[in-house]
Structure formats: C-alpha cells, structure tokens
Amino acid sequence: MNLALEILEKRGFLKQCTNLEALSTLMDKERVVFYVGVDATSTSLHIGHLIPFMVMAHLQRQGHIPIALVGGGTTKIGDPSGKDAMRKILSKEDIEKNVKAIRAQLLRIIDFSHGYILDNSAWLDNINYIEFLRDIGVCFSVNRMLGFETYKRRIKDGLSFIEFNYQLLQSYDFYMLNKIKNCKLQIGGDDQWGNIVSGVDLIKKKLGTEVFGLTLPLITRSDGKKMGKSEKGAVYLDAELYSVYDFYQYFRNVPDLDVKNFLYLFTFLGDDEIEHMSSVKGYLLNKAKETLAFEITKIVHGEDAALKASSAARAAFKGSEGDRADIPFFKLALDSLEGSILLIDLMVLSKVVSSKSEARRLINSGGVYIDKVRIGDQDYCLNKDNFINGEIELKIGKKRILRVIL
C-alpha cells in the first residue's frame, strides 16, 4: 500500500474506498490533487470537522495537493446526510459571513501555499437549470439514489425536493474540480459515501476518467458521549464561541480508553511516541492527556494560545504557578449582589449550569466549591466579603472551574 494510505490506515482514518488498490497505485505514481468539502452552515467549524482536515494535513505532508471546498453554493440547499429533518435555509448574507469565517479557520490549520481554498458558489450560482438537468441530471438514477442510506432514512419522514438535489450538486462539485484542477480524490465522513460514489460515477460517465472516493469513520467516545459535545454545547474551533482554555480542557479530560486513539487522530506525533505515552494506566496517563490537549490546541489555535491554556490549567488544578488570567471568568455586576446573592442563582447566571434544579443537585452531591471549600447548603449566599481581591473561584466537580469577578 502507498505510504500515505498506510499512515491513514495506521492512525485509524480509513473506513471505505471506492478502489483502494488503484488509488494506492496512483499515489505511488503522482502527487494526487484531493479535496474535502464543508458547508457554511455556521460561523465556525467544530471538532467533528477536524478529522477530514487532519487527513488533509497528513496527505499534504506526503506531497499530495489539497483543496478545501467551502460550500457557499451547496449551503443554500442543505445536505440531508445524517439529518432527521430539513436544515434551516440560511440567508445569502449569513452564508457569505460563514464562508469568510470558515476560510479564516482553515488557513490556520492547513498550509494553502501549496493548495487551494475554493467556494463552489463560483460554479453553482450561475447554473442554468434546464441545461443542468439535460447534461448532469440524466446521469443519475432515482432508484439508485433512493437506495443510499441518506435517502432511505429520510424518505419515510419527508424529504424535500430541494434536498434531493444535493447529491447532484456535490457530484457536480467533484466533476468541476476534476476539470479545473485535475482533482482525483474526494474525502469525507462515512455519511457522505452515497454522495461521493455518485460523484465518482458522474466523472466516469462524463469524462471517462477513474477517480476515487475515500470515507472516514464516525469518531465516538468510549463513554458514549457524542464526540464534539460538552456541557457547554458544541466544541467550536472559534475562540469566541468556545474558549481556548475550555477547548484544551475538553481534550485534557477525555476518558482513559480514548487517549491512544485520539493521539493518533488529533496529533502529528510519531507512532513510537504515541505507543509509549499511552502504554501506562491510571494517573500516569495524565501526561498523555496533557500532551493530547496541548498538541490539538496548538494545531487549532496556535502554540502561544496552547501554552497559555496549559499554564492556566496547571494554575487552576495543580496549584502551580501559572497564568490564571486565561481561566474562563464571569463578570458579576456589583448591583447584582444587592447585599448578597444565592449561590444557586450565581451558578445559573454564570451559565455553569442550565437550571436551578441542576445547581441544587450538584450542591447536594457535594460537587460545588467556592475557593476550594465544598459548599453543601442549597441556601448558601455570597456577599462582597466573599470576593477577596475582587474575585472568587467557583469549581464544579473535578474538571470545571470559573473565576467570578466583581
């Protein structure tokens, strides 16, 4: 097998390929142009998006040429893959804003001085519908499309015609990239298999060229929690939506059983180093978790931000010298105290919990601390005297910490 593909297989990235043997032969012969697509449904990518772009980085390191395709055009329709209901249709202005934001994030992760970031609105926005149906639509079998899992799942509950067109447009993207950039490989999540195979078939029918599709496994956590979700919601790559500190802590606190797998998926560390680092158990595995958190934070936010997050975590949880300024904080208005404020109300106000009932449950279970002192009273109140030097430290369980500042 080609070295680049061996690396992907070793690190757990390979799920399905349209023709792995032929792709391996091609990659031995030439620098292959490949692409990963992402729709502009949000102002930020989340960590679920990182997997295909980590693959992109690995392939680029082996000399192959990446294209990141931001779906300024396809976002106007919405991909039904993996969805139980139709996506919300975004305004043109929102899509343009999202495309710009996602482009900026990708530039931090991938070196596009030897690659491309493109927007499929460049060719989709001006399509003539009749010509598209005659030229492209004729190549698709409705019966075959309905056989793909994406449409099987949705057809029972209702699939709009606009969503049904999505597969044609994604296939057309691959067709256009093959024509203008000689792109021969599309990479995506395994839920994209039907769309990717359809693009491979379209190019074969229209151009007589063999191209390839490769899908990646859905990443799950050993504790059953959905990858990319936390108590605070989606783990975004935008520091304004999900702080660098919280991003670091998310990976620092992954279950022990996931450490080795995540080191392979989310870092560029060598095999020997990963195997050695993850061979220990118990508290000794904390070093590997810290390395995982630092490496992925460095990739997404840069080395300076990763160092600050690491320093803040040590200051918060180990009592070591570190920069507490990088620990998340909540600014409490003085007039909110009005003499005093219930701890339960402060927890809801600062959004460390979503409800008063959750706050009561945590206090009753002994999981709430003020300045390292456990609080067991649901009616506990704070006043200005609690805020030594203008702040307190609110800790929830072992892993969540917040500075509350006046």
From Swiss-Prot:
SUPFAM superfamilies: Alpha-L RNA-binding motif, Nucleotidylyl transferase. Its main location: cytoplasm. A motif ('KMSKS' region) lies at residues 226-230. A motif ('HIGH' region) lies at residues 40-49. It is found in: Cytoplasm. GO terms for molecular function: ATP binding; RNA binding; tyrosine-tRNA ligase activity. This is Tyrosine--tRNA ligase. Belongs to the class-I aminoacyl-tRNA synthetase family. TyrS type 1 subfamily. The keyword RNA-binding applies. L-tyrosine binds at residues 35, 166, 170. GO terms for cellular component: cytosol. NCBIfam families: tyrS. ATP binds at residue 229. InterPro entries: aa-tRNA-synth_Ic, Rossmann-like_a/b/a_fold, S4_RNA-bd, S4_RNA-bd_sf, SYY-like_C, Tyr-tRNA-ligase, Tyr-tRNA-ligase_bac-type, Tyr-tRNA-ligase_bac_1. Gene3D superfamilies: HUPs (3.40.50.620), RNA-binding S4 domain (3.10.290.10), Tyrosyl-Transfer RNA Synthetase (1.10.240.10). The keyword Protein biosynthesis applies. It comes from Borrelia turicatae (strain 91E135). PANTHER family: TYROSINE--TRNA LIGASE, MITOCHONDRIAL, TYROSYL-TRNA SYNTHETASE. Catalyzes the attachment of tyrosine to tRNA(Tyr) in a two-step reaction: tyrosine is first activated by ATP to form Tyr-AMP and then transferred to the acceptor end of tRNA(Tyr).
